Amino acid sequence: EKTMSKQIWKPGNMLYPVPAVLVSVADSEGKDNLITIAWTGTVCSDPAMTYISVRKERYSHHMLKENKEFVINLVSKEICRAADFCGVRSGRDLDKFEATGLTREKASTVNVPLVKESPVNIECKVTQVLELGSHDMFLAKVTAVQVDESLLDEKGKLDLNKAHLVAYSHGEYQTF
């Protein structure tokens, strides 16, 4: 019988892969930004709730605190390069939509643009902010979901495999 030998490591995040998403935010004056987030997920089914965790020093952080709305734009392999760019450049002095060629589209329930090229857009309203340490967690209620119709089968069932979504694991992007 084969035994497994294990090392004990210091506490760290080992839940991989994680989704890489583009989050759109805006301040109360309507200035918007895109931020790439890997710390995101589902926290409740009914009501539908999600979260994003953002470092306090990020440019988008004050927009989230001020406006309390955001859109999670799922990243396909087609827009992965743009998402990577948005993750390494600050939007403080740069329009990331313009810089990446992504298209702003009006959301249906929030005053934040969504990314037209994203296969799925999840509109969210912040219900609670938890200060955790390096990141603040923005818990949010999902207020609308927009889905690219080409991802639906003839019965209207969503087939996310067609979207070629991107995940992030240990510094690398992977498509599914």
What feature does the model see in each segment?
Residues K2-F176:
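Basic, polyanion-binding surface patches
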